[in-house]
From Swiss-Prot:
Coiled coil: none annotated. Keywords: Ribonucleoprotein, Ribosomal protein. The keyword Heme does not apply. GO terms for cellular component: ribonucleoprotein complex; ribosome. The gene is rpmE2. This is Large ribosomal subunit protein bL31B. The lineage of its organism: Bacteria, Pseudomonadati, Pseudomonadota, Gammaproteobacteria, Vibrionales. HAMAP family: Ribosomal_bL31_2 (MF_00502). PANTHER family: 50S RIBOSOMAL PROTEIN L31, CHLOROPLASTIC, LARGE RIBOSOMAL SUBUNIT PROTEIN BL31C. It comes from the Bacteria. InterPro entries: Ribosomal_bL28/bL31-like_sf, Ribosomal_bL31, Ribosomal_bL31_B, Ribosomal_bL31_sf.
Amino acid sequence: MKPGIHPEYRKVVFHDTSVDHYFVVGSTLQTDRTIEWEDGQTYPYFTIEVSSESHPFYTGKQRVVQKEGRVANFNRRFAQFGSKEG
């Protein structure tokens, strides 16, 4: 690798503010904020709104869309355009 052109890879503390969960991940993210972690070391700190701790796909708390109601509503509104009158 060419020296001097790659961003610094380091551990960063991410804070999922929606569920108040902290985790450390390796990243090249640049931030001026820092936080002291549980191991006593100081790491760069970054807040996020969604992570695997809060995203519906990973938590299993997905919102179910009522497809039948939407389809029925569509068919009711546009049924007249589908009928062929001779």
